[in-house]
């Protein structure tokens, strides 16, 4: 996602046509390291704000997040074996992304479907209405 999908595809195809396996340049390696550092910092920040609560008969970690949800969810679950899954709430996008690394839960069926969403056993999502954002504002400024 650093280069954009189309540019990346064209780059890969030209490398393959040149009969060389796509290799990253030193510049590419630096860019990837910078991006990985950004992701790592974001995960550490969100780890500090995560809270846990029961949900759907399991222990859920809750965090407000709008970026890097796959990396964030998987890493938080690995950092906190006491949680069964994590729910990442994107208040601006009105979405919730669910992630787990455990085998005994099907997030699509056991969690997301209860909130009008769906997905796979280890990755799922659901949406909520704009009115929820208004309720949050009312609660904060009440």
How should these model regions be labeled?
Residues 36-142:
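Gly/His-enriched, cation/cofactor- and phosphate-binding structural elements
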Residues 1-50:
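Hydrophobic, aromatic-enriched interface-forming segments
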């Amino acid at each position: 996602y650093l280069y954009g999908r189309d540019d990346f595809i064209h780059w890969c195809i030209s490398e393959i046509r040149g009969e060389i396996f796509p290799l990253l340049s030193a510049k590419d390696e630096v860019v990837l390291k910078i991006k990985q550092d950004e992701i790592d910092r974001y995960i550490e920040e969100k780890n500090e704000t995560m809270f846990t609560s029961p949900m759907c008969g399991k222990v859920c970690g809750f965090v407000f997040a709008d970026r890097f949800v796959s990396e964030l969810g998987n890493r938080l679950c690995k950092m906190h074996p006491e949680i069964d899954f994590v729910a990442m709430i994107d208040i601006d996008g009105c979405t919730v992304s669910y992630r787990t690394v455990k085998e005994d839960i099907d997030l699509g069926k056991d969690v997301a479907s209860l909130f009008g969403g769906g997905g796979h056993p280890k990755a799922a999502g659901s949406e909520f209405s704009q009115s929820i954002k208004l309720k949050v504002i009312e609660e904060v400024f009440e």
